Amino acid sequence: MEHLYYGIWDNVAKCYAWVGESKNNATFARMCNVMEKDEKTFIGQSPQDYIGYQLAAFNDETGEFCNHKEKVWEGKPNE
């Protein structure tokens, strides 16, 4: 089974604020969109500072780990 790993890059701190697993790009983007609308979350406080990337895929049957960085979400400023 393939596991996909994602990261939320903080443009101000110049590091990943969060790294974790998600089912696919759409479910990761949905999570980011929900947090972007909630000002109680770190993303919601300043969404324009964050970009979401798919970072890697891991196959738990073969042990293959593939690094690749693909932008799948970008925060937009609060209106």
Regions found by a protein language model. Give the residues of each.
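Short aromatic-glycine-(Arg/Gly/Cys) micro-motifs in beta-strand/loop hairpins
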Residues: 1-15
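Short amphipathic alpha-helical surface micro-motifs
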Residues: 1-3, 31-37, 53
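A short, exposed loop/beta-hairpin motif centered on an aromatic-Gly-Thr core
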Residues: 15-23
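Eukaryotic short linear interaction motifs
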Residues: 15-16, 29, 61
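A short, charged, amphipathic alpha-helix used as a generic interaction element across diverse proteins
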Residues: 24-44
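Short, mixed-charge low-complexity intrinsically disordered segments
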Residues: 37-79
